Amino acid sequence: MGFVKVVKNKAYFKRYQVKFRRRREGKTDYYARKRLVIQDKNKYNTPKYRMIVRVTNRDIICQIAYARIEGDMIVCAAYAHELPKYGVKVGLTNYAAAYCTGLLLARRLLNRFGMDKIYEGQVEVTGDEYNVESIDGQPGAFTCYLDAGLARTTTGNKVFGALKGAVDGGLSIPHSTKRFPGYDSESKEFNAEVHRKHIMGQNVADYMRYLMEEDEDAYKKQFSQYIKNNVTPDMMEEMYKKAHAAIRENPVYEKKPKREVKKKRWNRPKMSLAQKKDRVAQKKASFLRAQERAAES
């Protein structure tokens, strides 16, 4: 069949159906969402949990959510902007920060459900494949599925750094090593040491050393915050090791104290009846005084 021109007549516009709002805005892939959200029909009221990972310009957002008719319910959330509390003050959107955010999410969630002592996850970071398995006689491992949104799921994407952090933190998330840094698509082999380097920020440290030797100005420009916070390439691994330990020690979110706001009033408040009567009396007295002065003169 050849090219058929769409005739936009009255019937076309009468029967036109707009797409979902978030599809029109280019925010949600409903083809993927349908498959992530729909639960098995023999599980009835059991929610299907998703690990949502979104990378913005200055932050990494990790959430555990499940879908309801009214909208998605967020069970737990962790953000990269919380990492300065654990000793990571710079590079809050790199692969190592994504791993830390995923780890924080997992430990916080398990702590909330009282499962943090049962499922410790992988304490020693190796970068190798690790899967959480349910322990007999204990509650089953918390299972969820990665929701990468509209991100391109290429090998080495930061989304998978957050996933690895969550798995090492004790969550059961189906995955393979094919999308981790260190996987070679030609030889079909996975090098765990390369992945570990990314988790420990060694790829950034190597680039810092390279720039320091090759172009001092570019180094000062690109790593200005590292210089300001006295973070050198040799400190990187120790910094992330301490952060991982600190996250495991205390993953609980601390609520900020509510800021007292003093309300400002821009218009005059209404007067009470007594104030109005007093004002009238004052005006009367003022008027009478003026009359007396006029009579005297």
Swiss-Prot record:
It comes from the Eukaryota. It is found in: Cytoplasm; Nucleus, Nucleolus. The modification Phosphoserine is found at residues 185, 272. The keyword Ribosomal protein applies. There is a cross-link at residue 220 (Glycyl lysine isopeptide (Lys-Gly) (interchain with G-Cter in SUMO2)). Residues 253-297 are annotated as: Disordered. The modification N-acetylglycine is found at residue 2. The keyword Acetylation applies. There is a cross-link at residue 220 (Glycyl lysine isopeptide (Lys-Gly) (interchain with G-Cter in SUMO1)). GO terms for cellular component: cytoplasm; cytosolic large ribosomal subunit; nucleolus. The modification N6-acetyllysine is found at residues 5, 48, 220. GO terms for biological process: ribosomal large subunit assembly; translation. One of its GO terms (molecular function) is structural constituent of ribosome. The modification Phosphothreonine is found at residue 232. InterPro entries: Rbsml_uL18_euk, Ribosomal_uL18_C_euk. It holds the Pfam family Ribosomal_L18_c. Its main location: cytoplasm. SUPFAM superfamilies: Translational machinery components (SSF53137). Keywords: Acetylation, Cytoplasm, Isopeptide bond, Nucleus, Phosphoprotein, Ribonucleoprotein, Ribosomal protein, RNA-binding, rRNA-binding, Ubl conjugation. Residues 258-268 have a biased composition (Basic residues). Belongs to the universal ribosomal protein uL18 family. Component of the large ribosomal subunit (LSU). Part of the 5S RNP complex, which is a LSU subcomplex composed of the 5S RNA, RPL5 and RPL11. Component of a hexameric 5S RNP precursor complex, composed of 5S RNA, RRS1, RPF2/BXDC1, RPL5, RPL11 and HEATR3; this complex acts as a precursor for ribosome assembly. Interacts with isoform 1 of NVL in an ATP-dependent manner. Interacts with RRP1B. Interacts with IPO5, IPO7 and KPNB1; these interactions may be involved in RPL5 nuclear import for the assembly of ribosomal subunits. Component of the ribosome, a large ribonucleoprotein complex responsible for the synthesis of proteins in the cell. The small ribosomal subunit (SSU) binds messenger RNAs (mRNAs) and translates the encoded message by selecting cognate aminoacyl-transfer RNA (tRNA) molecules. The large subunit (LSU) contains the ribosomal catalytic site termed the peptidyl transferase center (PTC), which catalyzes the formation of peptide bonds, thereby polymerizing the amino acids delivered by tRNAs into a polypeptide chain. This is Large ribosomal subunit protein uL18. It comes from Oryctolagus cuniculus (Rabbit). The gene is RPL5.
